[in-house]
């Protein structure tokens, strides 16, 4: 088959987050691919939606069947107006709107052998087994990648056949390992020592590696990949280097990923010899039983011309009998598996198989779409070959609570597909719910779709509130499928809410654009949360997650929470008094705001991350903080004599350094940029080496420049070096923007201008302060001459126009922000012999961009939707709930029961994080003395310290006089006196914290809820 023209320019802005997952080569192959999706019920719609969002070149839809009521429970592209229309034709326009760069067409005829030759990948969903076998055989014959996917109620099935000789070019999601080189010996073998702190542990015997940036032993640079041997001390044998030049410094060693070959069986063979994706032998047996259940369901439909009726015991027993009579599965062509059939499992599958559920098709459709991408891009290992997924734990554990055939009968309702599994009574429960969704980004959009289709809050007494303060950006459109290009710049919450109402007109959804954080507790307070039945969080910040989780714990609300990073995803559920409360992963939470040590970043960087943080700080200091400082001085009209020492310190560096002279034109900006280049990468390094010479030795004889400390070398400016020129171009343009001057993007003219400019005088440049101590010392020596010079400079700045502080914007590649940071970091890497990272990775690191892809977000939303069923159904034991973690790149999915809440004790008391001490304020309101007495009499607690936030209400160690001032006051009166704030209108509880006599330091007492 011929691919589309894949040479067309890749829209990096649109696919920016996806590119961090797949890379440009894979994306080029994706946008040149042709895919056929046959079957446009809920599952097919999910597969198609994900492929369009991710930019597949051409998508052909095939489904001539008319839309029916049960489709609307999971097919978000259809509406009541589409009843009796062809599902493919009714879906085409909305799919095309998701991404105008994708050709979305409809095929109305049969699927023929000639038709299949037009595609690289063919996907069948909800197809009869006979159709699967026919199409699968033809695809296998012609080398067309083939997928078959289906869901039956709470069970899903996915089959992949990529042929007998399919090469995966890039099997893993991880970036190739790169490490800095310390030394390479001449010999056979040559021994390469990695710089201390490099990831030596991750290199393995037999790895193929390449080399770059080496000075001296240049023969290794860009040579063919070499195989390595890892020695016991962590050094690497890299082959014969006897004849190579002597190693001098620098360089990096980089892993070369090895392709892998996959051999798949055709569907007709794999039906009897199924190879299933499973994590244990128990899961293998479970999957084999589900495999037989699907085969029996196909046979039932073939015999009766219909699927089993919802919860019909007679039909279910017929399916069990058909499963018993199936030909036994085989381990090999000759060896049977000899596994017992789990008839109870098959029976349950059959009873609930008539339904179609939005969360199930979202989950399986995401996995199927990811497999399509693997087939096209040859990136990541494909499934081998069957995947079975079930969420039968959504059903009540008590058999007496299972729905009846009458409760599950078709009603001509948009929820018929869901009613067939859970019954009409459960549907009404869903419609009466009031839920809060925090975050309307990628996961939030997918959750809104699930909520709309399942009917959450769609009744007259139900409701759904969507909170998001952000506005839509173009880079959102490849994942956040409720948004369109015309929505860019509009509030996410408002657009998402309107789009969700379009999916289900009955949905009672309210958008709010106020953030949910400590500053808005007067909005999202006691009254607000009293109306909420549960919370779903779709946030990309651990700080925000922790806050929302704390509110759920405070108000005893169930929390559904999901997150993604690339093809990694998690979906977790937290139930009051049933599971543990949410805790952010310590490593992730700590890394969110933890900077590297200042001295490391400024003077002793050893990784590209260090240089990027330095470059980012340079941007802030040069183009934002200095401008804000001058503007503040202009507005305050402050003379130097009126300033205290800290103010002088604040102005000293920017005025005498960064902003020494106000530029008048583009040439002045270029001259400034060249001077700053010299300051940072030449003179600054020379001055550092005067402080710490290359031969400096510590008292114990250890060289100062050793281990992670790499001795830097000053750079010489060279207009023929693109990185040198990019720095000056970006810095000059940013300086011009800050001063309201026109810039330039002409590289040729810049080269010519630089030849004419005089070389900067190092004596006229800003002083380098190697530490805050030096800066303070410079201020201490600030005599009359320096004061006179600064006053003169301040007078010059005070009469000019205000400066424009620049706020770093990572997603606009035309503004020179990222250009400056990338160039500065790369030059810093050259100074210190550090392997640099490419522009894309630099942008990801400095912009703190989370790699994202539509498939992962859809999968975790589906998994959360399944947990929603359990939360809404009523009291369920902890064994019913599941935390889920998945890695689509490696076909990994684990679901496990949440932990129980940890129990703490103090004397006779026991509590968990879900408990609290409740004390009514009373009428008239009790005093502090009364509150303390109540706690001692009712709970046996002698309070040592009582706090409200940071306000200390009581301390047992206070003097009698101090206690006499506080004890007679009413609690709210005391709080207002100490904080200056009375309880907010509608506030029902004051939260107090206490510690008691006799407790250990680590005892965390439950919060005291003082009920107003």
Swiss-Prot record:
Residues annotated as binding ATP: 442-471
Protein name, as recorded: Ubiquitin-like modifier-activating enzyme 7
PTM characteristics: ISGylated.
Sequence repeat ranges, renumbered to this chain: 23-159, 423-575
GO biological process: DNA damage response; innate immune response; ISG15-protein conjugation; modification-dependent protein catabolic process; protein modification process; protein ubiquitination
EC code(s) of this entry: 6.2.1.-
Region (2 approximate repeats): 23-575
Keywords (A to Z) from UniProt: ATP-binding, Cytoplasm, Host-virus interaction, Ligase, Nucleotide-binding, Nucleus, Phosphoprotein, Repeat, Ubl conjugation, Ubl conjugation pathway
Modified residues (Phosphoserine): 266
Subcellular location: Cytoplasm; Nucleus
Entry-linked SUPFAM superfamilies: Activating enzymes of the ubiquitin-like proteins (SSF69572)
Lineage: Eukaryota, Metazoa, Chordata, Craniata, Vertebrata
One GO location term (cellular component): nucleoplasm
Miscellaneous comment: There are two active sites within the E1 molecule, allowing it to accommodate two ubiquitin moieties at a time, with a new ubiquitin forming an adenylate intermediate as the previous one is transferred to the thiol site.
Entry-linked InterPro entries: E1_4HB (IPR032420), E1_FCCH (IPR032418), E1_FCCH_sf (IPR042302), ThiF/MoeB/HesA (IPR045886), ThiF_NAD_FAD-bd (IPR000594), Ub-activating_enz_E1_C (IPR018965), Ub-E1_IAD_1 (IPR042449), UBA_E1_C_sf (IPR038252)
Quaternary structure annotation from Swiss-Prot or TrEMBL: (Microbial infection) Interacts with human cytomegalovirus proteins NEC2/UL50 and UL26; these interactions inhibit ISGylation and cause proteasomal degradation of UBA7. (Microbial infection) Interacts with rotavirus non-structural protein 5 (NSP5); this interaction promotes UBA7 proteasomal degradation.
Tissues where the protein occurs: Expressed in a variety of normal and tumor cell types, but is reduced in lung cancer cell lines.
């Amino acid at each position: 088959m011929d691919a589309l023209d894949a040479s067309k320019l890749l829209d990096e802005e649109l696919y920016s987050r996806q590119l961090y997952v797949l890379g440009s080569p894979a994306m080029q192959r994706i946008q040149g691919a042709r895919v056929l999706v046959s079957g446009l019920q809920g599952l097919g719609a999910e597969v198609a939606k994900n492929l369009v969002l991710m930019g597949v070149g051409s998508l052909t839809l095939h489904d001539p069947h008319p839309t029916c009521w049960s489709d609307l429970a999971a097919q978000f592209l259809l509406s009541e107006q589409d009843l009796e229309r062809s599902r493919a034709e009714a879906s085409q326009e909305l799919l095309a709107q998701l991404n105008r760069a994708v050709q979305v067409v409809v095929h109305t005829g049969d699927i023929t052998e000639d038709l299949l030759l037009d595609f690289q990948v063919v996907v069948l969903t909800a197809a009869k087994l006979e159709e699967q076998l026919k199409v699968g055989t033809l695809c296998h014959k012609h080398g067309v990648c083939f997928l078959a996917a289906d869901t039956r109620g709470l069970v899903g099935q996915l089959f992949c056949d990529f042929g007998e000789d399919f090469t995966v070019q890039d099997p893993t999601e991880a970036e190739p390992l790169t490490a800095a080189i310390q030394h390479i010996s001449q010999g056979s073998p040559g021994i390469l020592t990695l710089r201390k702190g490099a990831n030596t542990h991750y290199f393995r015997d037999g790895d193929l590696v390449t080399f770059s940036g080496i000075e001296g032993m240049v023969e290794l640079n860009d040579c063919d990949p070499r195989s390595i041997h890892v020695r016991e001390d962590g050094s690497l044998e890299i082959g014969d280097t006897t004849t190579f030049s002597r190693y001098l410094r620098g360089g990096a060693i980089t892993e070369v990923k090895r392709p892998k070959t996959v051999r798949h069986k055709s569907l007709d063979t794999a039906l009897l010899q199924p190879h299933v994706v499973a994590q244990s032998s128990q899961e293998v047996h479970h999957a084999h039983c589900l495999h037989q259940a699907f085969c029996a369901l196909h046979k039932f439909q073939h015999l009766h011309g219909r699927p089993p009726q919802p919860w019909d015991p007679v039909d279910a027993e017929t399916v069990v009998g058909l499963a018993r009579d199936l030909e036994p599965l085989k381990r090999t062509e000759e060896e049977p598996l000899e596994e017992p059939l789990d008839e109870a499992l098959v029976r349950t599958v059959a009873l609930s198989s008539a339904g179609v559920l939005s969360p199930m098709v979202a989950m399986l459709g995401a996995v199927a779409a990811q497999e399509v991408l693997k087939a096209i891009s040859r990136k990541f290992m494909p499934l081998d070959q069957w995947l079975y997924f079930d969420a039968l734990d959504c059903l009540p554990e008590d058999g007496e609570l299972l729905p009846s055939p009458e409760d599950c009968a078709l009603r001509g309702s948009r929820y018929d597909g869901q009613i067939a599994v859970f019954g009409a009574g459960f549907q009404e429960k869903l419609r009466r719910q009031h839920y809060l969704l925090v975050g309307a980004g990628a996961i939030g959009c997918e959750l809104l779709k699930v909520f709309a289709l399942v009917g959450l809050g769609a009744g007259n007494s139900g409701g759904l509130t969507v909170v998001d303060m952000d506005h839509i950006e173009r880079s959102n459109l490849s994942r956040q499928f409720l948004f369109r290009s015309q929505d860019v710049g509009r509030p996410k919450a408002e657009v998402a809410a309107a789009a969700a109402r379009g999916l289900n007109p009955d949905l009672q959804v309210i958008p709010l654009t106020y953030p949910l954080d400590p500053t808005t507790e007067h909005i999202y307070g006691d009254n607000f949360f009293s109306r909420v039945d549960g919370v779903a969080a779709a946030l990309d910040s651990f700080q925000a997650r922790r806050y929302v989780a704390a509110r759920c714990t405070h108000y005893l609300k169930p929390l559904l929470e999901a997150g993604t990073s690339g093809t990694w995803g998690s979906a977790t559920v937290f139930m009051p008094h049933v599971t543990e409360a949410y805790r952010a992963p310590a490593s992730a939470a700590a890394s969110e705001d933890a900077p590297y040590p200042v001295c490391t970043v400024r003077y002793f960087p050893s990784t590209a991350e260090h240089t990027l943080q330095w470059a980012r700080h340079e941007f802030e200091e040069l183009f934002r903080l200095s401008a804000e400082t001058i503007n503040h001085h202009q507005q305050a009209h402050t003379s130097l004599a009126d300033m205290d020492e800290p103010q002088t310190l604040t102005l000293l560096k920017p005025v005498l350094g960064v902003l020494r002279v106000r530029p008048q034109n583009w040439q002045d900006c270029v001259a400034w940029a060249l001077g700053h280049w010299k300051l940072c990468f030449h003179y600054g390094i020379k001055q550092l080496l005067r402080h710490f010479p290359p031969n400096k030795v510590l008292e114990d004889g250890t060289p100062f420049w050793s281990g992670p400390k790499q001795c830097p070398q000053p750079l010489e400016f060279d207009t023929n070096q693109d990185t040198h020129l990019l720095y000056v171009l970006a810095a000059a343009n940013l300086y011009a923007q800050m001063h309201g001057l026109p810039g330039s993007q002409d590289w040729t003219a810049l080269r010519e201008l630089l030849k004419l400019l005089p070389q900067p005088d190092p004596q006229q440049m800003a002083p380098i302060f190697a530490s805050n101590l030096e800066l303070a010392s410079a201020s201490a020596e600030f005599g009359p001459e320096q004061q006179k010079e600064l006053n003169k400079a301040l007078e010059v700045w005070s009469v000019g126009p205000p400066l424009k502080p620049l706020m770093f914007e990572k997603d606009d590649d035309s503004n020179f922000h990222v250009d400056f940071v990338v160039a500065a970091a790369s030059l810093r890497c050259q100074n210190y012999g550090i392997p640099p990272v490419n522009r894309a990775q630099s942008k990801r690191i400095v912009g703190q961009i989370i790699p994202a892809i539509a498939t992962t977000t859809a999968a975790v939303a589906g998994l959360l939707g399944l947990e929603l069923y359990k939360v809404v159904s009523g009291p369920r034991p902890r064994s019913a709930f599941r935390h889920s973690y998945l890695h689509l790149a490696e076909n990994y999915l684990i679901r496990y029961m949440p932990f129980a809440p940890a129990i703490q004790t103090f004397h006779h008391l026991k509590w968990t994080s879900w408990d609290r001490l409740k004390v009514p304020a009373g009428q008239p309101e009790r005093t502090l003395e009364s509150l303390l007495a109540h706690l001692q009499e009712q709970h046996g607690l002698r309070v040592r310290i009582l706090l409200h936030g940071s306000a200390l209400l009581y301390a047992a160690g206070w003097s009698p006089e101090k206690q006499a001032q506080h004890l007679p006051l009413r609690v709210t009166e005391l709080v207002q006196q100490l904080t200056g704030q009375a309880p907010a209108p509608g506030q029902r509880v004051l939260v107090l914290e206490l510690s008691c006599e006799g407790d250990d330091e680590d005892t965390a007492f439950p919060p005291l809820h003082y009920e107003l």
